């Protein structure tokens, strides 16, 4: 039901392209996954989302538990039917949101008690509860409940977070009984190399269908994130998919793929789109800028999305300046398409044997400016 086949390797880096098989179809890697936190990618219908080339979509356990509730989703036949998406799906455990968004009352080895920001009621979230919610939601991949330490954090605090994360993973494995759903573990460890290595080996020992690197993109310098990926990835099973959580910029994805990462997710493309910013040729353009007012050329002539094939820069500029909802939708569609295209281009470069030539300029030690 689940399998991962590596189709090609880069001879000069650790980059690889492969196919991750799920009950709802294959995911070609490396691949960017759009974020549909509340069973919707903001401002985009599932039909529009499918046309971006997206294959796997991420939703969030914490937010769906609060609204509408996993029982509503389960009654609809699961997350796929509830949102009308027929492709693969992944649910984050909600651990990051509990620690970053919730009003924490208590955290201990048992789990977390926090206050529901919607109605003020107390919620007791344990690894077992998070796993049960995800089984009810029914995504193809569920993530283990973990403790993501903030940045910066003391070494003792990160040690405690790692200890809990590993103990909670064991409890998630015990609680997880749904055979048509894969459970991924999450590596933590903050910016402490020895803790990252210990966490990677601990999580890898469970021999799960896949592994994620978490606790990045939480405020640490980019160089720290690069080092974490470089140090941790070789310790993860090479025959299983590796998922770098919360990363979606071109440079960071290229560097991560060069180090053997397969999957990514990030809210960046839709967040940028909602603020009038588009991704073109490796750059970010603010379409509110007056320079686009008289520009009647396509946004990106090389892009096949509806924003680029059906509209001009001047029209998109007009929509954004007029605060028309259509503008936000079109820009979000374009940005997702760009990130999916970028990961697809990396996969093709790996197959063609030119990944290191085409994407090496993204490496932090290279001064070259890369456009694609």
UniProtKB/Swiss-Prot annotation:
E.C. numbers: 2.4.2.29
Active site, renumbered: 92 (proton acceptor), 265 (nucleophile)
Annotated GO MF terms: metal ion binding; tRNA-guanosine(34) queuine transglycosylase activity
GO biological process, one term: queuosine biosynthetic process
Pathway membership, UniProt: tRNA modification; tRNA-queuosine biosynthesis
GO cellular component: a single term: cytosol
Reaction catalysis annotation: 7-aminomethyl-7-carbaguanine + guanosine(34) in tRNA = 7-aminomethyl-7-carbaguanosine(34) in tRNA + guanine
Positions of substrate binding: 92-96, 146, 188, 215
Matching SUPFAM superfamilies: tRNA-guanine transglycosylase
Region span, RNA binding: 246-252, 270-274
Cofactor(s) recorded in Swiss-Prot or TrEMBL: Zn(2+)
NCBIfam families registered for this protein in UniProt: Q_tRNA_tgt, tgt_general
Summary of subunit composition and partner proteins: Homodimer. Within each dimer, one monomer is responsible for RNA recognition and catalysis, while the other monomer binds to the replacement base PreQ1.
PANTHER family hit by this protein: QUEUINE TRNA-RIBOSYLTRANSFERASE (PTHR46499:SF1)
The protein's name: Queuine tRNA-ribosyltransferase
């Amino acid at each position: 039901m689940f399998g991962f086949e590596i189709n090609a390797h880069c001879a000069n880096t650790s980059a690889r392209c492969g196919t991750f098989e799920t009950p709802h179809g294959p995911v070609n890697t490396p691949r960017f996954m759009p974020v549909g936190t509340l069973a919707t990618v903001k401002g985009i219908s599932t039909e529009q989302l499918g046309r971006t080339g997206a294959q796997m979509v991420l939703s969030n356990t914490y937010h769906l538990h609060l609204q509408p509730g996993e029982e509503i989703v389960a009654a609809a036949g699961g997350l796929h039917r509830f949102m009308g998406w027929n492709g693969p799906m992944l649910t984050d455990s909600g651990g990051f949101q509990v620690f970053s968004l919730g009003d924490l009352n208590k955290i201990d080895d048992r789990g977390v008690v926090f206050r529901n920001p919607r109605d003020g009621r107390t919620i007791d979230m344990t690894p077992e509860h998070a796993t049960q919610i995800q089984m009810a939601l029914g995504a193809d991949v569920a993530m283990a409940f973990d403790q993501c330490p903030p940045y910066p954090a003391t070494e003792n605090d990160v040690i405690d977070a790692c200890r809990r994360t590993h103990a909670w993973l064991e409890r998630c494995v015990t609680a997880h009984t749904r055979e048509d759903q894969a459970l991924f573990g999450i590596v933590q460890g903050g910016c402490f190399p020895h803790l990252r290595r210990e966490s990677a080996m601990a999580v890898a020992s469970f021999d799960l269908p896949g592994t994620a690197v978490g606790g990045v993109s939480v405020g640490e310098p980019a160089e720290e994130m690069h080092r974490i990926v470089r140090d941790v990835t070789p310790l993860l099973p090479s025959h299983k998919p590796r998922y770098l959580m919360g990363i979606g910029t071109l440079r960071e994805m290229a560097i991560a793929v060069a180090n053997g990462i397969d999957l990514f997710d990030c809210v960046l493309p839709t967040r940028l789109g909602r603020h009038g910013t588009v991704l073109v040729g490796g750059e970010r353009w603010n379409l509110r800028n007056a320079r686009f007012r008289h520009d009647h050329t396509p946004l990106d002539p090389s892009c096949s999305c509806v924003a680029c094939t059906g509209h001009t820069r001047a029209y998109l500029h007009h929509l954004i300046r007029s605060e028309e909802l259509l503008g936000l939708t079109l820009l979000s569609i374009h940005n997702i398409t760009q990130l999916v295209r970028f990961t697809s281009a990396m996969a093709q470069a790996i197959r063609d044997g030119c990944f290191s030539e085409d994407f090496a300029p993204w490496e932090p030690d290279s001064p070259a400016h890369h456009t694609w």
